[in-house]
From Swiss-Prot:
Compositional bias annotation for Basic and acidic residues: 149-198
Upper classification of the organism: Bacteria, Pseudomonadati, Pseudomonadota, Alphaproteobacteria, Hyphomicrobiales
Record's function text: Involved in urease metallocenter assembly. Binds nickel. Probably functions as a nickel donor during metallocenter assembly.
The protein, known as: Urease accessory protein UreE
GO biological process assignments: protein folding; protein-containing complex assembly; urea metabolic process
Organism superkingdom: Bacteria
Organism listed in the record: Rhizobium leguminosarum bv. viciae
Protein's UniProt keywords contain DNA-binding: no
Record's keyword annotation contains Membrane: no
Length: 198
């Protein structure tokens, strides 16, 4: 079986892929995974670090041949506002709920969520159901330089028992990333468990 240990960004000149692999957005964050290509073949992706791939990126096989990554169609909502200011306000509400969103000049695209649709319609948005590739904006945790987006999240949360804020969002991490996703959570609750009793 052919292996892939390197990649090229979309738009690389003189690139002629011999095969393609279609992946939804939540399966394009990869390090090591067996990929099933559109032509029925398989290839083993084995990268040094996790990478968040975009539509059109190219995987380089050990024999030098290229495989193009395509963003698969997904069930989405297209959100439109009355004007640009209204659209920015809608984007703020979505960001406040930590939702993955594809931000464009005249619309916002998100995964279908009927609770969110009701909220957006209440804010005056037009919400349409669409099926197309989804390329959400990369969050602050992803490196902005190049494609090496390792998840080095060092969560130093100082968790008091009373948070004082309401997180009205759910994190349904049904993501098959294909790599070891290690989060180091160091919770400082002010407890010293080294109890020395005289």
């Amino acid at each position: 079986m052919q292996r892939v240990t390197s990649y090229l960004p979309a738009g690389t000149p003189s690139s002629h892929p011999i095969a393609q692999v279609k992946l939804p957005h939540d399966l394009r964050h990869l390090r090591r995974k067996l990929l099933h290509l559109e032509n029925g073949e398989m290839v083993m992706l084995d990268l040094k670090d996790p990478v968040l791939f975009a539509n059109g990126d190219l995987l380089v096989r050990d024999d030098g041949e290229l495989i193009e990554i395509l963003a698969a169609d997904e069930k989405l909502f297209e959100i439109r506002g009355r004007d640009r200011t209204h659209l920015v306000e809608l984007a703020w509400h979505l960001g406040n709920r930590h939702l993955a969103a594809q931000i464009e000049e005249d619309r916002i695209v998100i995964l279908r969520d009927h609770v969110i649709r009701t909220m957006l319609q209440g804010l005056g948005a037009v919400v349409l159901e669409i099926d197309e590739p989804f390329q959400p904006a990369r969050g602050a945790y992803h490196s902005q330089g190049g494609h090496s987006h390792g998840h080095d999240h060092d969560h130093n949360h100082d968790h008091g028992d009373d948070h004082g804020h309401d997180h009205s969002h759910s994190h349904d991490h049904d993501h098959e990333h294909g790599y070891e996703h290690e989060h180091e959570h160091r919770h400082d609750r002010g407890h010293d468990h080294d109890h020395k009793h005289d």
